[in-house]
Amino acid sequence: MCAMEYVRYLQESCLLISLDNYASKFTEKETVKKHYFVDNGLLHLFINNPDTLLLENLCAITLYKKYGSGVYYFNRNIEVDFYVPDEGLAVQASYRMSDESTLEHEVKALVALNSLYPLKRTIIVTYEDEGVMERDGLKIEVVPVWKWVLNGV
């Protein structure tokens, strides 16, 4: 049994959600996907260093509950964790923003996506960091995950 069959079984059992790459060609959309468990408890069984993966998985679950199949990821020369084109929303998941290179990586990706597709709202979801920054005319909210989930995205 190949891995794709396992993925399909997990999807049919409502244990896994899959996001398409918004930037990929039509033929790639079926093969190049990012997969997330619908429950962080399931993911926790399979990983050793859970912090970042659990945060990203929680963001995927939260966005999928609100926007359904309108949630994508973006990966073409830049990587943005979540993109909701109908809402003009881009979300990055980053456990800590204390490292300058991590901050720069997340911000550059949002600015680059905004230059391709004008965004109405950009958010970096973190474990505990909070603030607002502006880069190249783009307002970027940095929000702790608990506040982001409670406010309904």
Predicted regions and their residues:
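Short active-site-adjacent structural elements
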Residues: 80-81, 99-102, 131-135
